[in-house]
Design a protein with these regions (language model features):
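Post-DEXD/H (motif II) to motif III coupling segment of the RecA-like Helicase ATP-binding lobe
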Residues: 141-204
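Conserved helix-turn-beta segment of the N-terminal RecA-like "Helicase ATP-binding" lobe
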Residues: 59-95
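Conserved RecA-like ASCE ATPase "motif II neighborhood" in helicase/translocase motors
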Residues: 101-151, 321-323
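Conserved strand-helix element at the start of the C-terminal RecA-like helicase core
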Residues: 50-62, 239-271
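Conserved RecA-like P-loop NTPase helicase motor core
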Residues: 141, 288-416
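Walker A/P-loop
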Residues: 18-38
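N-terminal pre-P-loop "Q-motif" helix
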Residues: 1-19
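Conserved interdomain linker/interface between the two RecA-like ATPase lobes of SF2 helicase motors
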Residues: 187-259
């Protein structure tokens, strides 16, 4: 079993004292390992258990499953997925089959671990099974009108329920009941880890904002809804040109929307330009699916390749997405993110969180005592770089807003709040 960092141990300990509560940990702080440690203890100490893990997306549900099973590999743990995606494990969205699978495992005095999404959580509720513990990953997603009914029902069904997030959402007015400030549903905040603590521990690196002046070497005409793909492709290549050629970059590009993303890839030569510079290209959207270079692949293959390439220091790639990779997805090795759109505060914080994970060599050196966590000048990856194209007063306002969010989270230790 792995060892926990101090902030993870603190969260784990407080979970043993409460049956409900919110755990607020910045992106990159290892929330999943806190869940796994808690699950391991209760599976070991309390006999047969039914545990549910909820994620906002199928891709993340599959990733969480793999991370759980790396540690919880007993033959007594029976795994079920409740969503419409691909998985090698038993999967269903039919409530009667959910009940049959769970009750069979429990009748054999064994455990059932269910991985589901907020979208499919109602199917688990409708199955009528008893649930010992439920972990809500990226719990702020449960505040949405479409998802709250399942979250509310689970707050009455599960014996233990814990809500993990880096970006709490607050309710007010007509949405007050759904907000995470409603302790009747979400419990109170039982652990709040400030981001500066994680930076001091060497658990994450700080983000660095690098504005790109689109008027200085960029395009000479205004960006409109008609020319977005061409302008964004041009600016992207200008940004890539300016990267440090001594280090292989792994770049996450947040596109304005699926239409612009697809047009960039199919109606401009950006893919060929990136290929000529030695980059592999990956992209994923709900509408078009997952692609590696120009080959369409399943999501499991996509995620497996993403992990392998992320860990390969000799591989450089650009991954395009609209929103599917913003929350929770662990992509090791990402060095840069390029924001081609003005993101809402939660999505902005989540996207930045994708590139502030510590490089594996730096993490190993810290664990061996060969590297002091705060001496970033000696890190192989001293920062996670965030670039946004700016043009004129509006662009400057975007940069200022982005810097304000970064300072609040990573210098002042204030988690980004948004409203339902």
């Amino acid at each position: 079993m792995f060892s926990l960092r101090p902030h993870q141990q603190r969260a784990f300990a407080v979970m043993q004292e409460h049956n409900v509560g919110q755990i607020v940990v910045p992106t990159g702080g290892g929330k999943t390992f806190i869940m796994i440690a808690d699950a391991y203890k209760h599976l070991r100490d309390n006999g047969p258990q039914t545990i549910v893990v909820v994620a906002p997306r199928i891709l993340l549900a599959n990733q969480l499953c793999e991370e759980f099973l790396e540690q919880l590999h007993s033959k007594r743990n029976h795994i079920m997925h409740v969503h419409s995606g691909e998985t090698k494990h038993f999967s269903t969205t039919k409530s009667d089959k959910i009940a049959l699978f769970n009750n069979t495992a429990r009748a054999c005095d064994e455990n059932c671990i269910i991985f589901t999404t907020y979208h499919s959580l109602g199917r688990v509720v409708d199955s009528g099974i008893n649930i010992d513990t439920i972990y809500f990953d990226e719990a702020h997603n449960g505040c949405g009108r479409a998802h709250f009914a399942g979250v509310y029902a689970m707050s009455k069904i599960a014996n233990r329920k814990f809500y993990f997030t880096a970006t709490p959402r607050i309710g007010r007015g007509s949405s007050a009941f759904r907000g995470m400030n409603n302790a009747e549903v979400w419990g109170n905040v039982i652990c709040n880890v400030p981001a500066p603590e994680l930076i001091e521990q060497g658990a994450i690196v700080s983000p660095k904002i690098l504005p790109f002046d689109a008027n200085d070497g960029g395009v000479e005409f205004a960006r409109t809804k008609h020319n977005m793909p061409e302008v964004d492709a041009y600016n992207l290549m200008q940004i890539v040109e300016g990267l440090d050629s001594d280090h292989d970059a792994k770049i996450l590009v947040a596109a304005p929307n699926t239409r612009v993303l697809w047009a960039m890839l199919t109606q401009t030569d950006v893919m060929q330009q990136l290929k000529d510079k030695g980059y592999d290209i990956m992209h994923i959207t709900s509408k078009h699916g997952a692609y590696i270079n120009k080959t369409k692949v399943g999501r499991e293959k996509f995620f497996q390749t993403l992990t392998e390439w992320g860990l390969d220091d000799d591989r450089k790639f650009v991954i395009f997405h609209y929103s599917i990779l913003s929350e929770g997805i662990n992509v090791p090795g990402l060095t840069h993110t390029i924001l081609l759109r003005n993101l809402p505060i939660v999505e902005m914080a989540q996207t930045i969180g994708r590139v502030i994970r510590v490089h594996k060599d730096d993490r190993d050196a810290i664990n061996k005592g060969a590297l002091i966590p705060t001496q970033f000048e000696f890190f192989r990856k001293p920062h996670g770089y965030v670039t946004v194209p700016v043009c004129g007063k509006a662009g400057n306002a975007i940069t200022t807003r982005l810097q304000r969010v970064v300072d609040a989270i990573f210098k002042e230790g204030v988690p980004p709040l948004s409203f339902v």
